[in-house]
């Protein structure tokens, strides 16, 4: 199975600008990518990392500055044909992902396997149907369910918090420190981020 990991390497994670500088956002993006690559390789697969700009990574990086929709739809068209082929796509900002969660994503035999994000996005999918295409705008998990059914594909979903947790906002950083011991968590700790508890709520504060 072909497995792609698209990543924005040019101006990544702009919604973290209130807590991270541009260089730090890039470094943190590389750390999250390292966690995803490690999980995929541990599950016995070779990830194809595709970035909008060069990035440091343990595996080769293909630079492609197209948007996410045209990139992934081109991968679908070139990989999934009437006779054979399967494509998995896993987003690069899933630092909680593990070998086991990747195996859960790849295990079902449905034409389309979807991993919803907590905010209504689609954090990962597997496609074996030649007519399925993606549109990541808005509540994409809802749209991808409908698209799969419209083309006559069988659909299943993987209920995994580790696949569902993408890191976009400052509040999301607590999830990394709470539930991961990988490269992204290490980077946050080395950068001075620590968990705090205020009024019964766990948050993150930077102390240096």
From Swiss-Prot:
Catalytic reaction list: (2S)-2-phospholactate + GTP + H(+) = (2S)-lactyl-2-diphospho-5'-guanosine + diphosphate
Pfam families xref list: CofC
Q: Which GO terms describe its molecular function?
A: GTP binding; phospholactate guanylyltransferase activity
Its annotated pathway reads: Cofactor biosynthesis; coenzyme F420 biosynthesis
Q: Which of the seven top EC classes does this enzyme belong to? A: transferase
Q: What is its EC number?
A: 2.7.7.68
GO BP of this protein? F420-0 metabolic process
Report the SS bond pairs.
none
Q: Which UniProt keywords apply?
A: GTP-binding, Nucleotide-binding, Nucleotidyltransferase, Transferase
Family indicated by similarity: Belongs to the CofC family.
Partners and quaternary state?
Homodimer.
Q: What does this protein do?
A: Guanylyltransferase that catalyzes the activation of (2S)-2-phospholactate (2-PL) as (2S)-lactyl-2-diphospho-5'-guanosine, via the condensation of 2-PL with GTP. It is involved in the biosynthesis of coenzyme F420, a hydride carrier cofactor.
* Name listed for the protein in its UniProt record: 2-phospho-L-lactate guanylyltransferase
Organism (species) = Haloarcula marismortui (strain ATCC 43049 / DSM 3752 / JCM 8966 / VKM B-1809) (Halobacterium marismortui)
């Amino acid at each position: 199975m072909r497995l792609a990991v698209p990543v924005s390497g040019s101006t990544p994670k702009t919604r973290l600008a209130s807590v991270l500088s541009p260089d730090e956002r890039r470094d943190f993006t590389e750390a999250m990518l390292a966690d995803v690559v490690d999980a995929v390789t541990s599950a016995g697969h070779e990830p194809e990392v595709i970035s909008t700009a060069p990035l440091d990574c343990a595996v080769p990086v293909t630079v492609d500055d197209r948007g996410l929709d045209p990139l992934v739809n081109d991968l679908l068209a070139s990989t999934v044909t009437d006779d054979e082929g399967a494509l998995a796509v896993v987003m690069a900002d899933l630092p909680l992902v593990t070998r086991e969660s990747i195996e859960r994503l790849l295990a079902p035999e449905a034409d389309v396997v979807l991993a919803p994000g907590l905010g209504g996005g689609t954090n990962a999918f597997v496609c074996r149907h030649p007519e399925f295409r993606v549109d990541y705008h808005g509540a994409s998990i809802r749209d991808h369910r409908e698209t799969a059914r419209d083309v006559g594909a069988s659909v299943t979903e993987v209920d995994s918090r580790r696949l569902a947790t993408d890191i976009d906002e400052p509040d999301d950083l607590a999830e990394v420190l709470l539930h991961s011991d990988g490269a992204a968590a290490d980077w946050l700790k080395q950068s001075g981020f620590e968990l705090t508890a205020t009024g019964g709520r766990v948050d993150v504060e930077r102390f240096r």
